[in-house]
Amino acid sequence: MSKVIGIDLGTTNSVVAVMEGGEPTVITNTEGSRLTPSVVGFSKTGERLVGQLAKRQAVSNPENTISSIKRHMGESYTVDIQGKKYTPQEISAMILQKLKEDAESYLGEKVTQAVITVPAYFNDGQRQATKDAGKIAGLDVLRIVNEPTAAALAYGLDKGGDGKILVFDLGGGTFDVSILELGDGVFEVKATNGNTHLGGDDFDNKVMEWMISEFKKETGIDLSQDKMAEQRLKEAAEKAKIELSTVLSTNINLPFITADATGPKHLDLTLTRAKFNELTEDLVQATMEPTKKAIADSGFTIDEIDKIILVGGSSRIPAVQEAIKSILGKEPSKGVNPDECVAIGAAIQAGVLVGDVKDVLLLDVTPLSLGIETLGGVFTKIIDRNTTIPTSRSQVFSTAVDNQPSVDVHVLQGRREMAADNKTLGRFELTGIPAAPRGVPRIEVTFNID
């Protein structure tokens, strides 16, 4: 039986892993790295580049390079490259194809099945888009697993022991926090919260804005209008952010960043960790509210949380770690690799599905409530958020006026009170309702989530 791979399809980087001899193994790509940048580029001749090769040519070819496409999954968004339009699913499929090929060259056999992870807070449309990307890449996606849950699987299988775990996952573009209870091989998610548009990219952008502002003060030149300079600034901002996790000050030096009538201009700035913290303080604070909400929804007290697992590259930021510590009063566990544990968890779940991993049961939850629009534009919830899945719930509705021949069923997902403030999943019309006074016909609506 061919292997099922586990894929962490990330905003910034992606990772692929597989179960070998009962142990999860992270697969090294053809460039010799365990991380593959989630970047796609097209050369001037139209050749497609994915991963490190695409990232390397981004500065000289910014208009034909796409990064952070994950932030647009589930949206009606297209990228125009060399006169051709691509959907987020198609770009993501190119990244998945590269991971699939790397896995095949490592394993020496064809790979056709995968488990792919997504942010816990992804809605149904974003999850479906991820499945579609897998299909385009030639992969049968056996299961979509929430990233924090996958990280907890990796931690639990490696470290063992029972307890209540908080997984804090701050990646390149998304943020999730999940509370799980581990016991006797059962991984039960109690609550989840997050923000699908908060991550390392936003920290980079704050640094970039500061660099552009400082350079403008010094030279009067606005670099935000220069595509090529902007790509160099983005790379320098990311590098500075990473360095400031281990040092208190870093130098940002970009020679020949631009030129004017007086000649070439160089950017040379010093960014301290204190200044970085000041620039990004609102982003750090934005992770705290969902964390508090997830703890409250889990039914546990802060003192009952036994372990904190940090996932995602941005969780290495010292100010982020300090903020978590200030809420929970304990040091986060350093026992997992924040870049690799999600893919490892996906590989473990793949192992569970094909029977390679025994005595592990994963009980996840739905992150957003599922329901329909009722009279007055109200969102009536049928399945509440944080309900353990798989699940099935039914509710009986009726007509609003006498002799109503049909009902428009508007299916939504979200957490707001009014239908207009939530995400539409679909609409359908139920016709052929027998003539009767309002309130008499009984219409049963059933939702299944698997």
Curated annotation (Swiss-Prot):
The modification Phosphothreonine is found at residue 174. PROSITE patterns: HSP70_1 (PS00297), HSP70_2 (PS00329), HSP70_3 (PS01036). Induction: By stress conditions e.g. heat shock. Keywords: ATP-binding, Chaperone, Nucleotide-binding, Phosphoprotein, Stress response. Transmembrane segments: none annotated. The keyword Lipoprotein does not apply. The keyword Chaperone applies. It comes from the Bacteria. Pfam families: HSP70. One of its GO terms (molecular function) is ATP-dependent protein folding chaperone. PANTHER family: HEAT SHOCK PROTEIN 70KDA. Belongs to the heat shock protein 70 family. Acts as a chaperone. This is Chaperone protein DnaK. It comes from Megasphaera elsdenii. The lineage of its organism: Bacteria, Bacillati, Bacillota, Negativicutes, Veillonellales. The gene is dnaK.
